[in-house]
């Protein structure tokens, strides 16, 4: 045997260069991670959730180290054993033996290969394993559900917390043993323990013992896997079955097969281990082949035979017991038990008189005519103020009580800063990050009314009534409603965070720098005084953030002083997910005024994907509807079989404070996480009454539940199997929609209490299976007293569903003719608002669809829509008019509108002349309807030119009055021109002038 050839040595310079290159690579890989880690440490500390950061980091590091050392040690043992038991003399196959060359290379770098390969595999395994920290923490802190599964009688906590951990450990042990087997096999082959030369080759005793032992361990691990497979059958779905969980075939064929395979695996393992003593590899080979054949015949073939010849011919009867299990488990897992859901029979098409409709005051006085998915451009046009302020494309719904204590729903929005709308010099780094730092204002519009009647698209009216709580021109907070507000400045929100670098640098450093508001004289600035923000007054933190954001101005700009702070991670949902990484958040957040502050309310869910017998649901599929598709805002593509709205979170819009409240304190998953992160979640009892008044039943949860109720309202397993009594979520009938109809937040009569009091609720119609007729009406209460109660009105017969109702409305002769005139020659774009379904009268359903018009055919934000008509449908009859009151009267007759809200009806009493339009304009065209004799609708009264009577005005007041008069003149010119866009701009100028007049002193 020739001595091994020496490897060429590197020069000192080469070694230095290689070392520098490796150090640079390591720095590039680790440096950003270190910076992010330290920045996150600062950020979590500023929020008061540093314990969350340290707990997660500690768990990840420990898991990484344990798995890396374990996997690396097992692989190292496989290599070390092969090396230490190598033959003393290894014959070669000649001078060109490739194995000899590889052997020489390895021997020359023995430490590199002996330690480097196991270390690399161990580190790689540790990196992957640390991502499973959630599963490990749930195993360590999970408790019991207090409910047992129907097959094995085990508490569901075993399936939720223990079984996933056991499967994780088994997977890593299997991978580690397999890698050790491969390493040992290659080691023996390389060092001569296995030789393939000659007729039969050669295998040393050490190689045989080691390889056989590893194969035996693998088979024993497979036996343990068969044992765990038994439990996982309960969350398994067999193809072609309408339910989830173990069915007849699984219980009577697959389950026994798993036990048989387990026994065979143990026998095969014994046979494999016997080769250690018997020195005959044929026995373990036969055992391995037997295990493979058994898995095919017993594990796959036998269940297939049972399924085809026993179950399928009698499926409804055979699967009946297991369908009942699935129905009960799914209802429990998704919060649809009888304690939560109340079913009531409801005619759906009962006749109603005008008096009966008017008696439903809680519903008729709150009929919603503002569609939050349409009116955002109107908010932008009338309430934007500056180019850099912005409203989201889809606004939110919430409720407040008016001065009389009546519950009313509002379209609400925060006037946020949108960095993407900054222009020219506003985009300069200093301006973007130190001047334009925050939004200003909470805007609310009553959802059941508009500011005037829009009898013609070129007349005034039809726009929302705005209640703007903002910093006024004198620096004081103007808060006309719907609730008192002390701090309208908004530093945190989804719009302001919708850019790559959403940070703002704030704090006292000389004169105020942040743009705040303007008056007639000057621009006034502001200095942030909130508790939120990471201090960046020292050079270390400035350097870190300069590296994080790749921005040198952190180092050289003098706008950063010793009291400066940086606000970043400003999206409310992202902040909640960061401090509660175990939560899945709702796709929508909404602003509310709580205790005189603006807060963002975020719904958080705890989920599982292995609840026994519960149906597995895709969140992205179940929550998709026409609203989500329109803005490409879909939930995570996450599979769940258990969900609870366990946490309500608030994010202060001014200082970013995140507060977590336990909403469902009985949730075992939440209880486990409260043990992992103690003192991070406040008990439900600490939710203030003011906040409780603004908690909504979460939309994503409701959509998941309605999708499941479409199937799991059925009690009888045979009927369930036939699918004959299933329901469907209706498609959105709006011509521009392309997905399911979204649920709608409304204020209407309380279905949970079954009385005529007003309640804020989330509602949805449900169709019959593959039909357009109604099957049910579903309502979830958001009122504190009945929060979470779901009422389902089951509707017999053939009552028109949303699509049929919309078709009847849109094809009605009077409706189509009127809208055809308004939209002629593409002068105006007609848009249908949300089609609401409202239970009214003694047992009927009223469909309400607002109609909007905007100039031209564009979807641009500048073409702001306004309400021009309201259409209704009840028992195959259509009502139509400029207002809710007109439509109710048209549909039910005189008196039906007695309790409705909104502008006075256009129908005037007999003998009363209609008011004439100002400035000599011609009256608008008469509105067609189902009843003749409708008079033209007068436009809103003109704004008075000024105070009446003798009055001595100050200089500022007189100047403001002159602006009002000029704005009124411009408004009249725009009215005569017939240009809708010019008219809107003129109206905005008049509004601004009136505001300045009222604030002038």
From Swiss-Prot:
Signal peptide: none annotated. Pfam families: UPF0182. Keywords: Cell membrane, Membrane, Transmembrane, Transmembrane helix. GO terms for cellular component: extracellular region; plasma membrane. The chain crosses the membrane at residues 16-36, 61-81, 112-132, 174-194, 209-229, 258-278, 286-306. Residues 900-977 are annotated as: Disordered. It is a multi-pass membrane protein. This is UPF0182 protein Mjls_1469.
